Amino acid sequence: MIDENKKKNTNLNKNEYEEKSILKDLFHFFGKDFCVVQDTCIDFPVIWINKSLLLKVGKFLSSSPKPYNMLFDLHGVDERFRLNRLNLPEADFSIFYHLISIERNSDILIKVPLLKDDLNVSTFISLFPNANWYERETWEMFGIIFDQHPNLTHIIMPNEWKGFPLRKDYPARATEHESFFLDEQKEDLEMENLRFKPELWGMKRKNDNVDFMFLNLGPNHPSAHGAFRIVLQLDGENIVDCVPDIGYHHRGAEKMAERQSWHSYIPYTDRIEYLGGCVNEMPYVLAVEKLANISVPEKVEVIRVMLSELFRINSHLLYISTFIQDVGCMTPVFLAFTDRQKIYDLIEAITGARMHPAWFRIGGVAHDLPKGWNVLLKEFLEWMPKRLKYYVQLALENPILIRRSKGIAQYNQKEALQWGVTGSGLRSTGLDLDVRKWRPYSGYQNYTFEIPIGQGISDCYSRVIIKVEEIYQSLSILKQCLKNMPEGPFKSDHPLTTPPPKERVLKDIDTMITHFLQVSWGPVIPANESFQMIEATKGINSYYLISDGGTMSYRTRIRTPSFPHLQQIPSVIRGSLISDLIVYLGSIDFVMSDVDR
């Protein structure tokens, strides 16, 4: 049940933040003047350093006691049109490196300023191998060159793409581009660009004894779980190497955020991981609320948790059943869709929509809970535990499934952290990293629940079993929401709550004007930066927002868990069979919209 004594503010004040952070060690080693410390709404240090110090600082952090051993994110910002840059280093562009120390439960954001005439910086791959894909995406989106990168080529965009889409002077709308024509010559060029050339990836076509076969799995193979291609280098049935090919589902979600108001971007968040629903909205609205300095009522926190856990169960059921189907059993898929229908009925009764409610708001939720919501939730809580046993008895205890998945595609905790793995893949290595416990948000510190973990090695079977246990924990959280739903408003009484409470709009002319402006132009959010991570359905999802004091975001960075999970595939599956790859893909739990954004 919700424990009032557990409620606490998890943020540090500025003095505690500086004393307890890594800054003290960095200043001692590099000197007081090696960086500029930026004051933001972010709960951990944000520093600017010269690019000549990047690898030295990275090595210091990754090798220090209680090291910063995960590169969580890496991307760029076009600084040229940013108005509010007081006390920041001169920069036309910047790159940021987000590092996490597991032992410290602490982060640091390192920024490197770059001038337009010198957009070169050293690659970070020697310290963190998962920097590879992040650097490729940053290059193609901003034109920043990473020296000594092994393969600085397009990853999201097509090979023939011209221009750098996330630069501020690149058109954001299709109507701002020239008319598109696909003549025969251009069609031939695009088809040729899809041809896989092993030499470009450091692969040999043959060795002394055998000619390798190169096989396309996808981009429309049913076991690829979306528009996803993997090119396999094969010696018979054995995978010598492989190259994941992503980007087929890219829709420019981060670019769209620069053309939508803070309020009108909420529906777009649902489509990032299209099975997650309200879970996707959570980090975005929390990050905006930090910028606006909005505290929401306790009832809002509980409602948000309740909807998030419903969507978590819904996503996990689809994952578990499709994994079982990939191994060869059909029945659980039909069970899952029956169970998921009950969840959708409950979600629809509360929000008015099913998969993509766009229901969270800046400062609250769209409307209050309807009459009878508790009856529907109670019925579901009585139904689901009994049904969950069928999945285990029908399939997960089946000796054939166990032999097909235990010990397959396995990796340890160190490897998981190197590749930026989060979610059940990391927890099955024995590390209980769940943001709901480690860095509680939306009142998660007030709930009693456990974090299921594995025995030290993550394999296909352990990953799916962790998800089953997580459903039981989500059911426990939902019971606490049902039992302890507070009374009170469903929106914060704050000038930047969008839209304002309806009852005030109808009585107060000032509030009506505010409503009109916030819905049409959007709320004006103070200039600052904020960051929010959450435990999403597939791992850690986060939003890093930069406000320049306007009605729209200056920069919205969306870090999704599926992106690094697919990058890890070659390191895990080399030397295995094609049939093992199919099981491995089913065990990752990804959708391509989450990868490509």
Curated annotation (Swiss-Prot):
Domain of life: Bacteria
Subcellular location: Cell inner membrane
Organism from which the protein derives: Buchnera aphidicola subsp. Schizaphis graminum (strain Sg)
Protein name: NADH-quinone oxidoreductase subunit C/D
NADH dehydrogenase I subunit D: annotated segments: 211-597
Enzyme class label: translocase
Reactions this protein catalyses: a quinone + NADH + 5 H(+)(in) = a quinol + NAD(+) + 4 H(+)(out)
Subunit structure: NDH-1 is composed of 13 different subunits. Subunits NuoB, CD, E, F, and G constitute the peripheral sector of the complex.
GO cellular component terms, semicolon-separated: NADH dehydrogenase complex; plasma membrane
SUPFAM superfamilies: HydB/Nqo4-like, Nqo5-like
Pfam families registered for this protein in UniProt: Complex1_30kDa (PF00329), Complex1_49kDa (PF00346)
Topology with respect to the bilayer: Peripheral membrane protein
Enzyme Commission code: 7.1.1.-
